[in-house]
Amino acid sequence: RQMCIRDRTREAIFATAEKIGYKKRVIYPKIENVALLYFVDHEDELEDVFYHGVKDEIIKQAKKMNIQLSIYDRKDGMDHVPKDLSAFIAIGWLTRKEINALYKRCKRGVFIGTSPDEKLFDAVKPNMDSFVTQMVDYFVEKGHKRIGFIGGSDRNIDTGKPSMDIREWSFRQSAAYYGYLNEEYIFISERFTVDDGYRMGKELLKKEILPTALCVASDTLAVGVLQALNEGNIQIPEQVAVFSINDVNIAKYLSPPLTTIHIDIPCICETALDLLRNRVLYGGRVTKLVFVNGIPVFRKSC
């Protein structure tokens, strides 16, 4: 027996549902045998809470999307990863040898935070290039001309040796565009630790003339930089303004509270899982590289 509902009544029901925020429940088809490759070195995890946040969020969202995950980390090695995977999600840094071995096991995969071979696999990344460009643009609009950069290195997947990180590259391009690129104000370490930020902050203080603004590649580095500047009795932002990336929880409690670009980890993870579902359910030969933008959170450091 069918129930007849007038168009006006139906419209009223839909309007009320929309008003109270009702959302239709989505039934996701089950996807089994998906590997979560958490190939993050212990030192890297301590340096950048981004990785750990992504791992936790992927596990939470995968459960909601009916995706069955098995987790493997770097100490397990590629030999422990099954050869009959439906798909995989990779977080962290893999060598060329590991990437090739992974491709032989499974051709359906999504990398988060890196795109080691965009010809082979999908990837979702924070739009670091845009973040740094926004930072430089902001400082220039505020009248700064002596703009510095504090960051870390990337790694070459073929050699394992340090290579230029996209944030440094973007800073150099943006600063050069305005005619403000000064090598004396660029400080690079191999890693992104608080200690490295502190050390580079101390090196900065040795300069006879300080930059009036600093772009810092991550909040973790910025914690150390702020400590060094505070110990040097540098007034922030009056003498040196500081702008960073990540918006970790501690950022709002630093002295002064840190201006930073918020990275939307839930959005990144949802995008990655959507790519994975589409790849498993519908196939397709063209790989996708997705950049997720961030939102500046202005506090008292600039």
Write out the residue ranges for each language-model feature.
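N-terminal helix-turn-helix DNA-binding module of bacterial transcription factors
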Residues: 2-30
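Alpha-helical recognition/docking segments in bacterial nutrient-uptake
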Residues: 31-137, 141, 205-206
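Hinge/beta->alpha junction and helix N-cap segments in small-molecule ligand-binding domains
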Residues: 41-49, 73-77, 124-134, 150-200, ...
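Periplasmic-binding protein-like
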Residues: 35-36, 85-91, 148-151, 187, ...
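Flexible loop/turn connectors
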Residues: 200-302
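Alpha-helical structural signal in soluble globular domains
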Residues: 16, 57-61, 166-178, 224-232
